[in-house]
Amino acid sequence: QALFAVSCLVLLAALKPVMRTNWGRLFVFAVTLYTPASWAENTLRVYRDNIYPSLVLLALAGLLGAFTRFREKPLRALPYYVAAGLSLAAAWLCHEDNALLLPFVLCAAAVYLAYLFLDKSIAHKKSRLALLLVPLALWGGGIAAWCGMNYKYYGRFIISDFTSSEFNDAMGALSRAYPDDQKRYELVPLSTRLALYEVSPTFAKL
């Protein structure tokens, strides 16, 4: 909950150039802080489903903070770009369905580039364009560093077993073994495992 509150505070600061009144920003802060994602039952435990909404919100706040400052000095937006890049990398690492982040990031970048090149009054366009590479570099660099750590200790340049093709193939084969025994929230139920133990000595060792 503390991380979600911090993300809300970053959003509050990010909107300052476009929301001048304190009451307006306070309203956005309160509505965001008490959104169902912050107190839903499945997000009250300290694990990835708890921090994922916070990281996505922090990424959104970082991009908004950078984009709403496109008329100010380029370096004023740098902290927000850094926050966006780091939070995107962290969000990408803690969920398997991270591809859902791509449309959000691509749309945000497209809108920013459209304003940057179509608005003739914006100065330092090259500097602003270069700053857009900061979150992308932190995003990709964070993922690469994590994969590199896995390679160093486990010999696999992957994010996790869940993202490896071998794991997905194995779990897919196990889940398809006895389709009539499938249960909700149980990928390989006990009845399926017991049946597989009889025909697979290797699986039985697990």
Protein language model features and the residues they cover:
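Specific aromatic-rich, kink-prone transmembrane helix
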Residues: 10-13, 51-71, 86-88, 105-106, ...
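Membrane-interfacial segments
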Residues: 15-23, 67-71, 114-119, 153, ...
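Membrane-interface alpha helices of multi-pass inner-membrane proteins
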Residues: 80-95, 139-146
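Aromatic- and kink-enriched transmembrane "portal" helix at the membrane-lumen/periplasm boundary
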Residues: 1-4, 30-55, 89, 93
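Perimembrane helix-loop-helix junctions
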Residues: 101-136
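Short hydrophobic alpha-helices at membrane interfaces in multi-pass membrane enzymes
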Residues: 23-25, 66-89, 125-133
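Juxtamembrane membrane-water interface segments immediately following transmembrane helices
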Residues: 139-206
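Transmembrane-helix signature of polytopic, membrane-embedded enzymes
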Residues: 6-37, 53-54, 72-79
